[in-house]
Amino acid sequence: MARPAESVVDGSKAQAKDLPAVDRLLRGPAIAALVAEHGHTLVAGEARLLLDGLRVQALAGALGRAAVQPAALVGALDDRVRTRLASRMRRVINLTGTVIHTNLGRALLAGPALEHLLALMAGPNNLEYDLASGGRGDRDVVVEELLTTITGAQAATVVNNNAAAVLLTIAALARRKEVIVSRGELVEIGGAFRMPDVMAAAGAKLVEVGTTNRTHARDYSAAIGPRTGLVMKVHASNYALQGFTAAVGEAELARIAHARGVPLASDLGSGSLVDLAAYGLPREPLPQDQIAAGCDVVSFSGDKLLGGPQAGLIVGTKEAVGRIRTFPLKRALRMSKLPLAALEATLRMYLRPELLARDLPTLRLLTRPLAEIEALAAALQPALAAAVAPRYTVESVPLLGQIGSGSLPVERLPSAGLAIGPVQKKGAGRALDALAAALRALPLPVIGRIAEDRLLLDLRCLEDAGLFTTQLPLLQEALR
């Protein structure tokens, strides 16, 4: 007769028969409290999954008897329920040095935008209702006047992101026609969003002109023909061509296109609405400038330099924007009421440009004085050093950050922060990974970056130091 498996005869191991049935587990008084708090459906479902998992462990001989005790089962079930209810999207502390971080939600919403959003969503609102006439309204009205006032355009519409704005513009103005673009502007942005692929998806034929580094007016003139539906300029926001280069400006290109009866569209990508040079930052093209130069359509993002929610903003002539607004695809790409409310409040802030550097988080962080960041680094260094000792050392260091999200890609922002290095050089990589993981595991996760065998915490975006320092005891405990 075969000898029983060790797990069966080992008295320290639990067997599948030791596990209670789901109904029996749920009848316990401690579980009744869970059901009262969270409802029967959720608790019963998690109890079933818990017992299934424990049963697999028991059959494999890997389940200790302590795990099947009533108190242990209640604790495990409570953990499962709370984990299931925990939000997957969480607030974090961005110490990466990238202000508008694509993976960390891009632009921070300003206080007025958050307040307006909460106030409107607490009850019904006039999203598509005309209060004056009592009839059906148009959600574009919420922001169109603001956009035309700020940019000088005749009309405006909005969709849910700038990729959608570009797709919709091409589809509405050049479907089954040709779109002329310089070879040097056939960009790819994050997520494999390639301009040639967008053209194809919009039902237009791409016509490339010029070369990668030099395109002239004559190249556009020669390419325009009876099948041309659109001439397009694409701002290379996430890379830079330098050296022996040439490009045609919007004003000259508008004259060429309009002389042949063809509209000109410009995709600005990041889309700042204020001259960044006034704040000591490199200048980005403005929608206002593009409109004044004669562009029929200008599109740009809402959640980058503009400092608002994710949105694709389209401004231009009444004729061009009218065609875009009435194109069938527009409804599928329209903004929902939440980001539209936040966008309205953000755009209202631009009516008082003198206050933007104080009130708009994105601009406030980009223009934060270096001396202030350096002082913060010096102040935090002792506390962090004590929390990570004796395995790591901490020093205050100068750093170079960046704007992020494809905005001004070659520019760096002088900053300051804390550099954490392992005391033991052997296994330094693993030690830094462990520290980074411990920071991410904090209740309010801290995200830095590893470079040159150190974990760097750029403090430009840390405005409330208390959010960081109050978690240092937890970090210290995690590193023991």
Placement of each model-derived feature along the sequence:
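Long amphipathic alpha-helical segments
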Residues: A2-R84
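Catalytic-core signal marking the mid-to-C-terminal active-site face
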Residues: S12, A383-E452
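Short Gly/Ser/Thr- and Asp/Glu-enriched loop/turn motifs at secondary-structure junctions
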Residues: L19-P20, H38, I93-G97, L306-P309, ...
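Glycine-rich phosphate-binding segment of PLP-dependent enzymes
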Residues: D52, L95-T96, R106-A132
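Conserved PLP-enzyme active-site core in the AAT-like
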Residues: G134-Y350, L475
